[in-house]
Amino acid sequence: MRTAARLGIFFALCLALVTANPEQNVAAFDQGKLVAPGRLVIAGRRLTCGATATLVRDFEGFAVSSTVIMLNIEAMKDLPRPVQWLIYYHECGHIRYGPSETAADCYAVRRARREGWLDEKALDDICAVFNIAGHGPLHPDPEERCNQLRQCFAKKGGITAQDGTR
Protein backbone atom coordinates (compact mmCIF):
# COMPACT_ATOMS: atom_id res chain seq x y z
CA MET A 1 0.00 0.00 0.00
CA ARG A 2 2.74 2.45 0.97
CA THR A 3 4.74 1.60 -2.14
CA ALA A 4 1.71 2.05 -4.39
CA ALA A 5 0.94 5.42 -2.79
CA ARG A 6 4.53 6.57 -3.21
CA LEU A 7 4.54 5.45 -6.85
CA GLY A 8 1.31 7.35 -7.45
CA ILE A 9 2.77 10.48 -5.89
CA PHE A 10 5.98 10.03 -7.88
CA PHE A 11 4.17 9.78 -11.23
CA ALA A 12 1.90 12.72 -10.43
CA LEU A 13 4.92 14.78 -9.48
CA CYS A 14 6.79 13.77 -12.64
CA LEU A 15 3.85 15.02 -14.67
CA ALA A 16 3.77 18.22 -12.65
CA LEU A 17 7.52 18.70 -13.11
CA VAL A 18 7.16 18.44 -16.86
CA THR A 19 4.54 21.19 -16.86
CA ALA A 20 6.03 23.35 -14.08
CA ASN A 21 7.82 26.61 -14.82
CA PRO A 22 11.36 26.02 -13.49
CA GLU A 23 12.15 29.74 -13.36
CA GLN A 24 9.44 30.58 -10.86
CA ASN A 25 10.21 31.04 -7.16
CA VAL A 26 7.54 30.16 -4.64
CA ALA A 27 6.15 32.67 -2.20
CA ALA A 28 5.00 31.57 1.23
CA PHE A 29 1.36 31.72 0.13
CA ASP A 30 1.57 29.63 -3.08
CA GLN A 31 -0.23 26.42 -2.06
CA GLY A 32 -0.42 23.43 -4.40
CA LYS A 33 2.76 24.22 -6.36
CA LEU A 34 5.65 21.98 -7.25
CA VAL A 35 8.84 23.97 -6.83
CA ALA A 36 11.89 22.96 -8.83
CA PRO A 37 15.11 22.16 -6.93
CA GLY A 38 16.94 25.31 -5.88
CA ARG A 39 13.90 27.59 -6.32
CA LEU A 40 12.26 27.39 -2.88
CA VAL A 41 12.40 30.52 -0.71
CA ILE A 42 11.05 30.30 2.84
CA ALA A 43 11.12 33.26 5.21
CA GLY A 44 13.62 35.06 2.98
CA ARG A 45 16.10 32.17 2.60
CA ARG A 46 16.61 30.04 -0.51
CA LEU A 47 16.59 26.39 0.60
CA THR A 48 17.83 23.44 -1.42
CA CYS A 49 18.07 19.70 -1.08
CA GLY A 50 20.16 18.66 -4.04
CA ALA A 51 17.97 17.57 -6.96
CA THR A 52 14.84 17.17 -4.79
CA ALA A 53 11.74 19.19 -5.69
CA THR A 54 9.34 20.58 -3.09
CA LEU A 55 5.56 20.32 -3.19
CA VAL A 56 3.92 23.18 -1.31
CA ARG A 57 0.40 22.20 -0.30
CA ASP A 58 -2.13 22.07 2.51
CA PHE A 59 -2.17 18.83 4.54
CA GLU A 60 -2.09 17.65 8.14
CA GLY A 61 1.21 18.55 9.77
CA PHE A 62 4.23 20.57 8.64
CA ALA A 63 6.27 18.43 6.28
CA VAL A 64 6.87 14.96 4.89
CA SER A 65 9.32 13.46 2.45
CA SER A 66 9.32 10.61 -0.03
CA THR A 67 10.63 11.36 -3.52
CA VAL A 68 9.89 15.04 -2.92
CA ILE A 69 9.68 17.24 0.14
CA MET A 70 6.10 18.27 0.92
CA LEU A 71 5.67 21.40 3.02
CA ASN A 72 2.57 22.89 4.56
CA ILE A 73 3.69 26.52 4.35
CA GLU A 74 0.42 27.72 5.88
CA ALA A 75 1.06 25.63 9.03
CA MET A 76 4.67 26.84 9.21
CA LYS A 77 4.16 30.56 8.50
CA ASP A 78 3.85 31.70 12.13
CA LEU A 79 6.86 29.71 13.34
CA PRO A 80 10.19 31.50 13.88
CA ARG A 81 12.29 31.58 10.71
CA PRO A 82 15.00 29.21 12.02
CA VAL A 83 12.31 26.65 12.89
CA GLN A 84 10.88 26.84 9.35
CA TRP A 85 14.34 26.37 7.84
CA LEU A 86 15.18 23.50 10.19
CA ILE A 87 11.92 21.71 9.31
CA TYR A 88 12.89 21.86 5.63
CA TYR A 89 16.41 20.58 6.28
CA HIS A 90 15.03 17.83 8.53
CA GLU A 91 12.94 16.58 5.61
CA CYS A 92 15.98 16.90 3.35
CA GLY A 93 17.79 14.71 5.88
CA HIS A 94 15.17 12.01 5.32
CA ILE A 95 15.70 12.23 1.56
CA ARG A 96 19.45 11.83 2.05
CA TYR A 97 19.63 9.40 4.99
CA GLY A 98 16.33 7.52 5.17
CA PRO A 99 13.72 7.13 7.89
CA SER A 100 15.87 7.77 10.98
CA GLU A 101 14.41 10.81 12.79
CA THR A 102 17.64 11.35 14.70
CA ALA A 103 19.77 11.23 11.54
CA ALA A 104 17.40 13.69 9.83
CA ASP A 105 17.55 16.04 12.83
CA CYS A 106 21.33 15.76 12.98
CA TYR A 107 21.69 16.50 9.28
CA ALA A 108 19.45 19.57 9.65
CA VAL A 109 21.33 20.95 12.66
CA ARG A 110 24.76 20.44 11.14
CA ARG A 111 23.76 21.96 7.82
CA ALA A 112 22.23 24.96 9.58
CA ARG A 113 25.37 25.41 11.68
CA ARG A 114 27.57 25.24 8.57
CA GLU A 115 25.37 27.86 6.87
CA GLY A 116 25.92 30.11 9.88
CA TRP A 117 22.36 30.81 10.95
CA LEU A 118 22.06 28.26 13.77
CA ASP A 119 23.55 29.28 17.10
CA GLU A 120 22.73 28.33 20.70
CA LYS A 121 19.94 30.95 20.89
CA ALA A 122 18.26 29.72 17.70
CA LEU A 123 18.58 26.14 18.95
CA ASP A 124 16.87 27.15 22.22
CA ASP A 125 14.04 28.73 20.18
CA ILE A 126 13.69 25.56 18.11
CA CYS A 127 13.53 23.42 21.26
CA ALA A 128 10.87 25.73 22.73
CA VAL A 129 8.70 25.25 19.63
CA PHE A 130 9.20 21.48 19.75
CA ASN A 131 8.09 21.48 23.40
CA ILE A 132 4.89 23.32 22.47
CA ALA A 133 4.16 21.34 19.30
CA GLY A 134 4.68 17.89 20.80
CA HIS A 135 6.42 15.04 19.07
CA GLY A 136 3.96 12.61 17.54
CA PRO A 137 4.53 8.87 17.27
CA LEU A 138 7.73 9.02 15.19
CA HIS A 139 9.90 11.64 16.88
CA PRO A 140 11.56 11.29 20.27
CA ASP A 141 9.87 13.17 23.11
CA PRO A 142 10.72 16.91 23.02
CA GLU A 143 13.31 16.84 25.81
CA GLU A 144 15.14 13.84 24.35
CA ARG A 145 14.94 15.34 20.87
CA CYS A 146 16.44 18.65 22.03
CA ASN A 147 19.25 16.82 23.81
CA GLN A 148 19.99 15.01 20.55
CA LEU A 149 19.87 18.30 18.60
CA ARG A 150 22.37 19.82 21.03
CA GLN A 151 24.68 16.80 20.71
CA CYS A 152 24.58 17.09 16.91
CA PHE A 153 25.21 20.82 17.15
CA ALA A 154 28.31 20.25 19.30
CA LYS A 155 29.63 17.33 17.24
CA LYS A 156 32.17 18.00 14.49
CA GLY A 157 32.19 16.15 11.17
CA GLY A 158 29.57 14.81 8.80
CA ILE A 159 26.28 13.09 9.39
CA THR A 160 25.72 9.42 8.78
CA ALA A 161 22.55 7.39 8.98
CA GLN A 162 24.16 5.52 11.89
CA ASP A 163 24.01 8.68 14.02
CA GLY A 164 20.51 7.70 15.11
CA THR A 165 18.19 4.76 15.02
CA ARG A 166 14.85 6.49 15.42
Predicted regions and their residues:
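An active-site-proximal "capping" alpha-helix that borders the catalytic cofactor pocket
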Residues: 99-115
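Long, well-structured alpha-helical subdomains associated
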Residues: 117-166
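Active-site recognition of the HExxH zinc-binding catalytic motif
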Residues: 86-95, 105
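Auxiliary, metal-adjacent structural segments of Zn-dependent hydrolase domains
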Residues: 21-65
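Soluble non-cytosolic domains of exported or imported proteins
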Residues: 78-83, 98-102, 140
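Bacterial N-terminal signal peptides that target proteins for export
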Residues: 1-8
